[in-house]
A protein has these predicted regions:
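Phosphate- and divalent-cation-binding pockets in alpha/beta enzyme and binding domains
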Residues: 44, 85-88, 121-122
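Alpha-helix capping/helix-boundary segments
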Residues: 9, 41-42, 82, 101, ...
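Active-site neighborhoods of divalent-metal-dependent phosphate/nucleic-acid chemistry enzymes
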Residues: 55-61, 65, 69-115, 129
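Short, well-structured N-terminal submotif of metal-dependent ribonuclease cores
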Residues: 1-38, 51-66, 108, 117, ...
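Generic structural signal for small/hydrophobic residues in well-ordered secondary structure
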Residues: 7-8, 45, 86, 105
Length: 131
């Protein structure tokens, strides 16, 4: 099964795994899970790091590259199809990072791993990963 890991789940898996529920931990550790991390997550992390609102032990480029290898995450680039799909989503909230993740999950037929309850307002397959 293909899973798209949202930014908060990605960060929790790296440094605060206790925040993830057991089902999420099992999916992330399973050798049969196809795990993807979007370029939008990298953008969000780099942006928040630059603003000073997300402390990291090293630069985002190093941190993310290391995490992709450790967790065997596949990179998911942003396409024009994703961008257009994000623009077509109902406006349940205005976070552009979240909207892009939802659009990508829909376009690529992936299940979104998230800890953000607002995602439930959209018609996207998801698994809630928080406790």
């Amino acid at each position: 099964m293909k899973f798209l890991v949202d930014t908060s789940v990605f960060l929790w898996a790296l440094s605060e795994e206790y925040k993830l529920n057991p089902a999420a931990q099992e999916i992330l550790k399973s050798s049969t899970s196809e795990l993807y991390f979007s370029a939008v997550g990298s953008w969000e992390i780099a942006f928040k790091f630059a603003l000073g609102s997300l402390p990291l032990p090293k630069a985002p480029s190093e941190y993310i590259s290391h995490a992709l290898r450790v967790w065997a995450l596949r990179a998911l680039d942003i396409t024009h199809e994703h961008a257009l799909r994000a623009g077509e989503l109902p406006v349940h909230h205005r976070d552009p990072f979240d909207r892009m993740l939802i659009a990508q999950a829909l376009s690529e037929e992936m299940t979104l791993l998230t800890a953000d309850r607002v995602f439930q307002k959209y018609k996207v397959d998801l698994i809630f990963c928080g406790k």
